[in-house]
Amino acid sequence: MSLAQPVVAIIGTRNPDHQQERKARFLSYELSHSHNCTISTGAAYGIDEAAMKGALAEKLNVYLPWSSYNREIIPDRAKIVVASERLHPHWYASVTKYHPAANRLKPGVRSLHARNYGILEHADLVIAFPNADGGGGTGQGIRIAEALNIPVMQFNKGAESVLFSCMLSNALLYLDRKKTDAIAA
């Protein structure tokens, strides 16, 4: 972890409810503007888009499955990383390792899931806004984060606002503790 800039991945559903979208945008804003965090996300419509809108563009890493993916919603000054099987073979290997039906995925979907590994691989914390069934790319992201021992905080549809406040407080405490531990080491 970088002492100056912890990395927080914000991932989630493409069909968020209004509260999920607002909370993703707020968390991204608060973490990047007030707590010097880099936000890592994937440029899908929905939660990823909300995270991009909230983040300070200079502290935003956006991971794409292919170069033309949703470019119109990515802020100009964001850092963009495009998945490439040649450059990121471990991203693609992660699909086979963590996806329950990897052998049935079409190439484009495989690239979407591969880029999930890129979003998470340098994260200190993952904040996830899954859909009701918890599957899809967000489910894949949660499986990857758990395998990499990255803490995951989930905010599901219908969660209480108290949970949101606790989640932000816990996220900040966790990041402060990691920073303190790194300084002491």
Task: Label every model-predicted segment.
Residues 2-7, 14-168:
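Acidic/glycine-enriched connector segments
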Residues 1, 178-185:
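Short intrinsically disordered terminal tails
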